[in-house]
Amino acid sequence: MPTDNDLKTSIVELLRDLDALLVAHFYQKDEIVELAHYTGDSLELAKIASQSDKNLIVFCGVHFMGESVKALAFNKQVIMPKLSCCSMARMIDSHYYDRSVHLLKEYGVKEFYPITYINSNAEVKAKVAKDDGVVCTSRNASKIFNHALKQNKKIFFLPDKCLGENLALENGLKSAILGINSPEEIKNADVVCYNGFCSVHQLFKLEDIEFYRQKYPDILIAVHPECEPSVVSNADFSGSTSQIIEFVEKLSPHQKVAIGTESHLVNRLKAKRNHQNTFILSSTLAFCPTMNETTLKDLFEVLKAYKNHRAYNAIELKDEVARLAKLALTKMMELS
């Protein structure tokens, strides 16, 4: 059995031989992040990979991320060591999007402006594009939301109800959740949210904030906007993974901070600063199971197979789906 160091050496050699670009999301395992040419959040990696001069992109993340790169750069080869699917992205597909639109119309919502969080598959992004909507990420969500408000239509935000509710609260707007609230509440809401969520960020609770504030009165709380509204509204800072990193790295090493996002990222931040002053905002192990499926062995095997002309786990999209998804993604990039 090859050791981890053997695998790392082989992976570096294969990447060089294949002239490939390796990108990894912040939530990937440390040994994967260590080898990546670039690490980042969804928006950063989509831009970097699609604009790279490399023809072969190796994406360590979850499936919708690979799809986004393929849609933006259709002629590139995009492969993934694991075709892991984000649990939130699994909560909606094109069929459920159509059903949601049907419900909105049944409830008397004649016009709406759809925003899909990037955590959705390419077919959903294509549906949103056909309805003249746009994609957003947690980093640019406020800018995209402000653009949507100028359309003077009810906003349909999918699939993450928490991010949608948090954006509504940020703008003093009334929100309702499709499938939870009554037809009358849906009709009267400014923002209608699909009933999806992140299984990791649901672990962070208001009680966790209260615990840390009681124990350390001067502590700062930084969370991801996929957390529940009660958590976000009581935090000192809310932002994307990149924004959380930027926020924490600017703090004095003496400043205590509790962070509400995936544990691998928090542990890396702890290693960079005074670990005794850096905490994860949960007593539960908050790691993303699908983000952590990718191993060094998976990465080595997918590269070796590609070199031997036995490629697998290649991202494929229908031409029309890719074209429409690209429209929604490009619109997002132009607005942000």
Swiss-Prot record:
Q: How is the cofactor bound?
A: Binds 1 [4Fe-4S] cluster per subunit.
UniProt KW keywords: 4Fe-4S, Cytoplasm, Iron, Iron-sulfur, Metal-binding, Pyridine nucleotide biosynthesis, Transferase
Q: Name one Pfam family in it.
A: NadA
Q: What class of enzyme is it?
A: transferase
List ligand-binding residues for [4Fe-4S] cluster: C86, C198, C288
State the reactions this protein catalyses.
iminosuccinate + dihydroxyacetone phosphate = quinolinate + phosphate + 2 H2O + H(+)
EC number(s) on file = 2.5.1.72
The protein's location, in the record's own words, is: Cytoplasm
Task: Check the record and name the SUPFAM superfamilies matching this protein.
Answer: NadA-like
Q: Name one GO biological process term.
A: 'de novo' NAD biosynthetic process from L-aspartate
Species name for this entry? Helicobacter pylori (strain J99 / ATCC 700824)
- Protein family per UniProt: Belongs to the quinolinate synthase family. Type 3 subfamily.
Mind telling me what this protein is named? Quinolinate synthase
Traced from the root, the source organism's taxonomic lineage reads: Bacteria, Pseudomonadati, Campylobacterota, Epsilonproteobacteria, Campylobacterales
